[in-house]
Structures are given as C-alpha cells and as structure tokens.
Amino acid sequence: MSDLPGIVVTGASGRMGQMLMRTVLASDKARLVGAVERPGSEWVGRDAGAAMGGAAIGVTVTDDPLEAFAQAQAVIDFTSPEATVRFAELAAQARAVHVIGTTGLDPAHLEKLEWAAHHAVIVRAGNMSLGVNLLTRLTQKVAEALDADWDIEVVEAHHRMKVDAPSGTALMLGEAAARGRGTDLDRARVSGRDGITGPRAPGSIGFSAIRGGDIVGEHDVIFAAAGERIVLRHVATDRAIFARGALRAALWGQDKRPGQYDMIDVLGL
C-alpha cells in the first residue's frame, strides 16, 4: 500500500471534501495520507474517518497544509479562490500534483497559479466529470459548424448553497462556444439579463443561473435559430462523479512535467 500515490484532500469537512476522501479510501490505486481544514474548524485534530461518522482511518485532520503536502504525491482541492492560491504555492514547494476544482478564480488568482505551474503539475477544470468534458467538446464542435444566425445561451442550475454564478462549468462551456465561434468570451458574454435590455446583441453568448434545493448540477447549451433549436444537456445526480474525475486527474499527473493541464488532457479527448 505504501507505494501507492498519497493523496491529501483540502476542505475536508465540506460535502466535496468528504466525498473526495471516501473516493480515495475506496480506491485500490491511491491512499489518503492527509486531510486539511481551516484553522479553528472543529474537525482539526480529529481522525478524518471518525469526523465523517465512520471508523477511524489513522489520518488526523490538520490546519497545517505544508506539513500535510510534504508527505503527499497529490493534493485535491475544491475550496475557495484565496485558499487555492495559497495551496498552489505550497503544493509547488512539495512538488505535489495539484488538482483544482475550485471555481470563481479571477485573473489575479490565475496569474499566481501560472507561477506555481512552473514547479509542479496543476490540473484545473471547472468540472471533473467525463460527461461534462464530452459536452465541452461537443459544444465547440457545434459552435464551429453553425453560423452566426444561431444564438448561444448557457443555462445552469445548482443547489441553494452555491456562492458563485455562473458556475465554473457554465463558463467552461461558454469558453468552448466562443472558441468554436472564433471569438473571445469576455467580449461576447452577457450574464443575467434584467429589465429592458433591448434586442439580443449579435454574436453574444448568454448565461443564466438557477439556484435552489439540492440540485447537484445541470447545464444546458442552447443553440437557437429561426424555427429550430439544438439543446446539449448534462445532468449530474451524484457529486461522486466529480470526486472520481479528480482522483483520476491526480493519478494521471504523477508522471507529467510541470505545467497547467485540464480534464481534456486527462481524458485524452
């Protein structure tokens, strides 16, 4: 077992953190060697397995990420932009693969990740599932095939606790549509229309967000023209798909050169 890649999960007490730890524990290709929480969390100092309501697993939750990362070959990180930037620096010091599922990263955050990627492998994606990454490829292909008479809209739905909008996945799909159109998403993007907005701007890519209940994640890419419509859709019913994808990325990155990668690279799409 000790020759298997060691994985550290950050944000251990969160829903995704717990799912990630369970996924690693259930795997015969990796081992859980660390769990990180923010200072002051009631989980710090507790056995991670017991904190999740199960049997002890011999991994104590810590608020010292550098100590945890030093014994790991990979870090899986679904936290906040500020925490992720800090973890990227520490993972680079430890030369650990850093798998990032955190969303809401701005250009300043991305610049810091670029620096960290000079020293370690970073795999970053707005969504780690196979289905969504296939949808991303399809979105680009359809956008390439259709002319400007087809309007593009991205509609996403998530649970009431999600704090950012549009979702990272929605933006990933929008980027794919923009690439297919040969345009820049920053110029084409229109988010959350309200009031008297006037006619739709030609070439724009619209985003709408729904928040409610316990929706895991739903994404529609709509291509609409006069008299017809194409809808590409992905529905996630279990966040375990993201955890499995993240673990796959952590294992894939073990023999790669430092740099930034995404799930398209991991999946070979």
Curated annotation (Swiss-Prot):
Entry's EC annotation: 1.17.1.8
Positions bound to NAD(+): G11, A12, S13, G14, R15, M16, E37, G101, T102, T103, A125, G126, N127, M128
UniProt keyword Amino-acid biosynthesis present: yes
Catalytic reaction annotation: (S)-2,3,4,5-tetrahydrodipicolinate + NAD(+) + H2O = (2S,4S)-4-hydroxy-2,3,4,5-tetrahydrodipicolinate + NADH + H(+); (S)-2,3,4,5-tetrahydrodipicolinate + NADP(+) + H2O = (2S,4S)-4-hydroxy-2,3,4,5-tetrahydrodipicolinate + NADPH + H(+)
Binding site for NADP(+): R38
Active site: H158 (proton donor/acceptor), K162 (proton donor)
Keywords assigned: Amino-acid biosynthesis, Cytoplasm, Diaminopimelate biosynthesis, Lysine biosynthesis, NAD, NADP, Oxidoreductase
Subcellular location: Cytoplasm
Gene3D superfamilies for this protein: Dihydrodipicolinate Reductase, domain 2, NAD(P)-binding Rossmann-like Domain
Pathway note: Amino-acid biosynthesis; L-lysine biosynthesis via DAP pathway; (S)-tetrahydrodipicolinate from L-aspartate: step 4/4
One example of a Gene Ontology biological process annotation: diaminopimelate biosynthetic process
Function comment: Catalyzes the conversion of 4-hydroxy-tetrahydrodipicolinate (HTPA) to tetrahydrodipicolinate.
HAMAP family assigned: DapB
Gene Ontology molecular function terms on file: 4-hydroxy-tetrahydrodipicolinate reductase; NAD binding; NADP binding; oxidoreductase activity, acting on CH or CH2 groups, NAD or NADP as acceptor
Gene, per the UniProt record: dapB
PROSITE patterns: DAPB
UniProt: (S)-2,3,4,5-tetrahydrodipicolinate binding residues: H159, G168, T169
Top-level enzyme category: oxidoreductase
Name of this chain's protein: 4-hydroxy-tetrahydrodipicolinate reductase
